[in-house]
Amino acid sequence: NINNSGLTHSDPLDGSPQYMHFTTKNGDTRTFQYGSRATNPIDQWPDPDIYTHKSSGQTLSGSETRNLNRCYPGVEDGTLSEQVAYAVTNMIKTLDIDMEIDLHESSPEYAVNNATVAHERASAIASEGVLNLELEGISMSLEPSPVSLHGLTHRELGDYTNTYALLMETGNPSQGRLRGYTDEDLVKTGEDPCY
């Protein structure tokens, strides 16, 4: 998680576990913190009634101001979320990073699921990747990055840097609204009787 503030909380009413534990081949236990992609309200408050994306002027619900994936390419002296997005954009430019893949999980009922979303400059690479996954028996669709929806990594990093910008979205019931009890097992296995 590139937004450390997001690791300090979970989304309201989600009841997500705070940590996940994995046992390695040699028997050691590795612990990973589990949080939200949204900046903790303690670190960025209050939410405005309407969030205005700085570089495009697009308006969204006020709570989206803390959603990192609505803040790209970022603002150097903006909110914490906008500063994190700016730092990522600046790092990609400074290091001349060729390709970035933003990994997401979504609820199984989400419309864009098991999909690769590609900026138009990255569509050839994404097409080949999706085809290779399909040949391996992994179902994946290809979606174009919407030109008119701003703040998203695959749109803004593709527009504001030279990187090939991609996002991969996979479904996991631990993100779903219809799930049952949420624990470490559900997060790791993605198995829930409600799905």
Predicted regions and their residues:
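Active-site/substrate-binding loop(s) of hydrolase catalytic cores
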Residues: I2-E120
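C-terminal accessory segments enriched in acidic
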Residues: E76, L80-Y195
